[in-house]
Amino acid sequence: MSLKPALIDGADIRERLRVDHQRFLEELDEVCTVTDERRSQARLQELRRGWRVHALTEEMVVYRALEGVDATASSGNRADDRFAEHELVEAMFDKLSCLTPHMHEWQARLDVLLSLLQRHVDTDHFEMFPRLAERFDAAQLAELGEQFALARDKLTLLEELKAA
């Protein structure tokens, strides 16, 4: 995934997340079509860095905001599920980085990664987005979007420096 954030000024947090999610799914599909092994691994590593930025930013901004207004035990368990989901995706990236692209196991694990990412997207869109809409007004959602963009930009810069 390109670490360069999409320019969507004034967008609320849900739109910023939708854009990130769409880019992840599209770029993961592209990894499947690259036939050169080195390019496949390079694309996968770029996507992994983008995922790391997205996940950390989502945890710092969105989950923290929801935890601040959701003090119930069940919502705490759901937050734990989301953190675990992020860890599963990262673990799958670990496994893929040790495999030869386009071999049977690599493709199988790539399919699992796609399923995990799709589950993450669906959970965000169908569970978290409605909760955000219930708990925050338009101005607050826009502010969360700005906080997300700022945090994402900072983490992106750090990831780029680490990769250089």
PLM features: residue spans?
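Small-residue-biased structural context
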Residues: 1-164
